[in-house]
């Protein structure tokens, strides 16, 4: 479900790759169907999860599910590539840490580290001076308290990803303000208690 929230809608097309023990036991344990259900926005207690392949077809979502050896990845890893008309492609790599919890470890090829269990702002931006200050100022203006902030980048002056966990839900006005800033490529907000 974190992947769907990050993408902002259910994808029209998805490629799902299972690695390690997910590849070995995913179908037997229902991991494959649970991943498709999450992309469709189904909650963990949704009775349609065993039928998620059929539901995806009915909703017009094409997908492929394959096993893949992902070098250096955690044994319980899934890699998901999502596409939809008018939405930039998104590639997410995450692994299970047990008990229904996950850790997102790559976003569009950049190493990251977050769970989506807290209110989380994810900003993809050009790696240049002043971006972190702009984000902090916008959050301060909206009276949002930052719990943690991590910054990742592909290379100096390349693309960066800020992962900001907050104590409150971030209002749409603050998200809109951030999206309007030059150098900001994409802004996504994960509300663990919000809609998918």
Q: Where on the chain are the PLM-derived regions?
A:
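A structural-propensity feature for long, helix-poor, extended segments
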Residues: 15-54, 58
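Contiguous domain-boundary segments centered on the initiation and propagation of an alpha-helix
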Residues: 42-87
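A conserved regulatory-domain signal marking ACT and ACT-like small-molecule sensing domains
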Residues: 27, 47-51, 65-68, 88-196
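Conserved active-site segments centered on acidic
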Residues: 11
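Non-catalytic surface loops within mature trypsin-like serine protease
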Residues: 20, 84, 166-168
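Alpha-helical support elements that line or immediately flank enzyme active sites
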Residues: 1-7
């Amino acid at each position: 479900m974190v992947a769907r929230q990050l993408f902002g809608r259910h994808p029209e097309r998805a490629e799902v790759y299972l690695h390690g023990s997910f590849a070995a036991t995913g179908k037997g344990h229902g991991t494959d169907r649970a991943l498709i259900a999450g992309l469709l926005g189904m909650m963990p207690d949704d009775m349609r999860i065993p039928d998620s392949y059929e539901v995806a077809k009915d909703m017009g979502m094409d997908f492929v599910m394959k096993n893949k050896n992902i070098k250096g990845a955690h044994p319980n890893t899934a890699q998901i590539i999502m596409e939809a008309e008018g939405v930039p492609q998104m590639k997410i790599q995450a692994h299970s840490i047990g008990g229904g919890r996950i850790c997102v470890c790559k976003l569009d090829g950049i190493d990251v580290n977050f769970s989506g269990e807290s209110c989380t702002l994810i900003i993809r931006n050009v790696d240049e001076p002043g971006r972190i200050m702009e984000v902090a100022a916008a959050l301060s203006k909206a009276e949002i308290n930052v719990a943690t902030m991590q910054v990742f980048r592909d290379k100096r002056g390349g693309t960066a990803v800020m992962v900001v966990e907050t104590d409150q839900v971030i209002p749409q006005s603050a998200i809109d303000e951030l999206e309007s800033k030059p150098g900001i490529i994409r802004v996504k907000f994960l509300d663990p208690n919000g809609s998918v």
